[in-house]
Amino acid sequence: MNATPAIVMPSTDEEIWRYSRIAERFDDQQQRLDGLRRFFSFSNEITPREFDGYARPLLQRTLAYAWAPRVEAAQRADFEQRTSAWLGQGYVIRDQDAQGNWQPAPLRDHYFPVLYTQSADQPALPYGLDLAGQGARQATLARALEPGSMAVSEPLQIMDAEAGRPAAQAGGLLMVAPVFAERGPDNAPSGYVMALLSMRQLIAALYEDIIKPRLAGVPASARCWSGK
């Protein structure tokens, strides 16, 4: 038994308009993230307060924003020490496994740890999380290496950083954009800004704008579901 809704492409002007609204919402996310990228690109140094002040107004329809600078292996100890003093709390570049357990990141040539993060509520992107050590996230970074580029991850499970279990917003997409304020080795990005998007919110928008209007006035017994 296959109980998936039949997918029908837009065929009327009204349906095309509704699909365009979904595209516009995604374009809006890209524009907001690009604004955050430019904020970093044209600033010499950004404080946690400045990041929070810029990112917080952008949080509508976005779970979190974050900044992850590139840290070379030789810089790690000094970076962790300075960041702990700067943030006023212990800071370690770290990895999280599939069960939500944390451990210090092993030696790597370089790291992209979350340094600043801003969210309206949990889940946020945890401080110190090394994107270079997270398979799907690292693959996303690898697709955004050129100035002006962006990449979106495959659907990810979002972990509650404090509880060590899947968060209420269990599914999400990570949109990343490279920053080239200072060219790294081999012209690599100096860091990434990122937005964490809720799959639940995206699906809700799809339902409200596309599916619900199609079902309006259609008897339940006549609604289009494939069943073989």
Show where each model-derived region lies.
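Membrane-proximal amphipathic alpha-helices
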Residues: 4-33, 40-48
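Intrinsically disordered, low-complexity polar/acidic regions
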Residues: 11-16, 41-228
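Generic detector of short, locally flexible boundary/turn motifs and exposed helical patches
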Residues: 30-35, 116-118
